[in-house]
Amino acid sequence: MKFRIYITILALSIIGFQHLMGQGSKISGFISSEEGPARFVNISNLNSSFSTMTDTAGYYKLSNIPEGTYDLQITGVGFETLTKKVVVAKDASSILNFLLTKGNNTLNDVVVTGTLKAVRRTDSPVNVEVYTPSFFKKNPTPNIYEALQNVNGVRPQLNCNVCNTGDIHINGLEGPYTMVLLDGMPIVSALSTVYGLSGIPNALVERIEVVKGPASSLYGSEAVGGLINIITKDPNKAPMLSTDIFFTTSKEYNADVSFKVNAADKASILTGINYFNFQNIIDKNHDNFTDMTLQNRISLFQKWDIKRKNNRQFSLAGRYMYEDRWGGDLRYDSSFRGGDSIYGESIYTNRWELLGNYELPFTEKMMLSFSYNEHEQDSRYGKTSYIASQKIGFTQLTWDKNAGNHDLLFGIALRYTYYDDNTPTTQNADMLKNKNAPHITWLPGIFAQDEIALSKKHKILLGIRYDYNSYHGNILTPRFAYKWAIDPENMIRLNAGTGYRVVNLFREDHAALTGAREVIVANELNPERSYNVNLNYIRKFFIKDGTYLAFDLSTFYTYFNNRIVADLEQDPNKIIYDNLQGYALSKGINLNMDISFPFGLQIIAGGTWMENTLNQNGVRTQQLLTEKFTGTWAVSYTYPKSNISIDYTGNVYSPMRLPLLSSTDPRSPSSPWWSIQNIQLTYTGLKKVEFYFGIKNLLNWTPNKGNPFIIARAHDPFDKKVNYDANGQILATSENPYALSFDPTYIYGPNQGIRGFFGLRFKIL
């Protein structure tokens, strides 16, 4: 009897619930963007829990909505969030359509780096990673060099404890294997990569495109390990005024100001000014040397977009940078520059650049690109003087042609490099003449590329480049790529190619100029050759509750012939350069992950496992200063209705082999696991202003932890108290018990501890 009563009550409850639900209202409609239906977009109410998602055709439906006023929020990967206030009448049916605008997601960004053509990222057979300013704002930095620490597989590497020179590693390969472009032009190269990278302000950047693996078939020498293309802002899209100013509790000050002027209907002109100042002497490890290099830097940038008939392109850009930096003994000032009493490393840098693009007035799409830069460096490393001048000119003409299912690209290029310094490197071989002999390199090249659409899902790319180096002769670099778009959520890319590289000693190892080591070139250095294959798989998931997941998995393998190696271990007083009598390998796996939840949480994380080895005479050794694992993350959350967002960013590195001076050197032969972590709060409640503040290096990690010192014999940087035996080897004495000489190159991470920061951004559209 009781069972029947329960069944009756349950049935009546269900009928009553269905009746009540049937009294609600309905909202349905179509959501689209400029590219068509917006699939898998989430529609939710900020004031209650009901939500739904658009189908594959862009349609949605919300049922059983009580009468009332609601704030509907439409969110989707790749689109700006849209919020609309909706009034729902009792038992009504409403049709509401929405148009979404493109947001900061990078899945469908237009990229140019992979193929020298402007294509959607998803259409490119070459995997190009895209990073926008919104990504770098999660951990604000004064320049591009520092900003790249949050990119998986890319590591800014400091090479000197005193002057803080650095380069950029991609997949564990040293800086010389990374090509850095500015708007596709080889502006940052050779000498300028040592100090020029820190002079590129973030305010110039529209986006950064990263290609991992060789791209020599399109870009020539240096694009062996990968390339980084810094795309500057378009004057037509830039705000009228933009300002970003921040400072840290370490007394670092950075200011970015840009403004736009429209010259009638003829041109748009964007001007940017960046100033960075750090003059606070810090010595927390108590070695009487500066922990961080003091810097005073200004950079001026201007870009013109000139209007032409038929919307043909014509842009010009110029940049000037001046920097004065020094590090060393706490007692150092400019009066000791170049002397042997108080050690300091002082570098004055003057640099200017000009670059442009001009579309020729033909029916065929032909583009002339050109750039020129001069880099003047006046430096003292203790008593060692290094004064260098570099001039690089580049021009390239491309012809973009479509023929059926063939997307063709043909190009010719010419690169001129002038390099001169005050060392024997640029001295005439005839010592009796004692004449200066600058290095002048001519590098003409021609290339062709054919992207073939076999079907809607299958593409292949064939490319080949021929260069003639005035020192090394003929160089041929082929390329192959294949893309299989299984469906909109699954994609496979396969890339293979070759690369080549020539050497620049100062760029190869800054330790050559510390004054602590003698540079020895054992034999005539031949160009390196590399052979690479890269397999990439992208998988995207759109979950019904509005959650989005994307996984980007890549495996890479590179084989090197004639690998140029700087031997720091054979003799503590020398750097010995030679081609490896064997081969080198670089292999590993990259995984990038992007998760977006409908309630405002976003996670961007990645990890790279890699192995970089040198194989000579049957002996395999791990490359110095190269980790086997690196991980990065950025966790962001926006609090609803509060205009407050929080960003937690960081990276982690596995141990790496470090260069020691001898077997008695007490410093650790390898680094520990180490991590730099940061947190930031941003307030955007004001119309034109946003404030941000936070803490950098939450764990207060520095490389001196666990070591008795990181700079060997900082108290005797000129080695005046070092004794040698008859063979030139250092003797152990009571004053020098470990038999060491001055060595500032034991460094693998930034020597800057925990600090706070505060900043504001102001923008007028």
Write out the residue ranges for each language-model feature.
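C-terminal beta-signal and adjacent terminal beta-strands/loops
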Residues: 652-659, 683-765
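Flexible loop and strand-edge segments within Gram-negative outer membrane beta-barrel domains
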Residues: 278-299, 305-366, 372-391
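Short acidic/polar hinge/loop motifs at secondary-structure boundaries
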Residues: 63-64, 169, 185-212, 300, ...
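Gram-negative outer-membrane beta-barrel transporters
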Residues: 453-457, 551-559, 579-660
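N-terminal periplasmic accessory domains that precede
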Residues: 95-98, 144-147, 166-169, 181, ...
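Short, acidic, small-residue-rich periplasmic hinge/interaction motif at the N-terminus
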Residues: 30-46, 75-79, 89, 93-137, ...
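Membrane-embedded beta-barrel scaffold of Gram-negative outer-membrane proteins
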Residues: 367-379, 485, 493, 526-579, ...
